[in-house]
């Protein structure tokens, strides 16, 4: 089901601070995805927060428009993020930051979110010992 419920939103201040300080990041302009493994209060694979800087977009209307596009792209593609996490029986906190200077279209937003999902899946998958042996032999 493609929903984005309240339980899936990251709102706990300590978790947000810890994700920013200890998390790993993936960059795909105009987005930065910061994630860290966390023990969440609810039984979901991940909680997500989306943010657009006030310094780049002075008008709240513009910030809200970008966040709305980000939420919709996340909602439609969240299974690409959550399935790898669920396979490993982990829980993660994820922060999605918008760092661009202009408002992008939904199509651009969705394509960048999909690219982030692919890179995220590659980064969190456990290292395969067979793959490591092949690397060391070469």
Residue ranges: model-predicted function:
Residues 1-138:
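Positively charged, solvent-exposed patches that mediate nucleic-acid binding
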């Amino acid at each position: 089901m493609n929903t984005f419920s309240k339980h899936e939103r990251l709102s706990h201040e300590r978790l947000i601070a810890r994700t920013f300080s200890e998390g790993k990041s993936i960059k795909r302009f105009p987005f930065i995805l910061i994630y860290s493994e966390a023990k969440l209060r609810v039984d979901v694979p991940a909680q997500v927060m989306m943010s657009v800087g006030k310094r780049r977009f002075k008008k709240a209307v513009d910030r809200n428009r970008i966040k709305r596009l980000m939420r919709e792209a996340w909602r439609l593609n969240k299974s690409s993020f959550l399935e790898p996490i669920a396979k490993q029986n982990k829980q993660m906190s994820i922060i999605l930051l918008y760092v661009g200077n202009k408002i992008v279209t939904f199509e651009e937003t969705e394509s960048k979110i999909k690219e982030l999902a692919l890179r995220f899946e590659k980064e969190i998958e456990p290292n395969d010992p067979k793959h490591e042996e092949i690397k060391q032999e070469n």
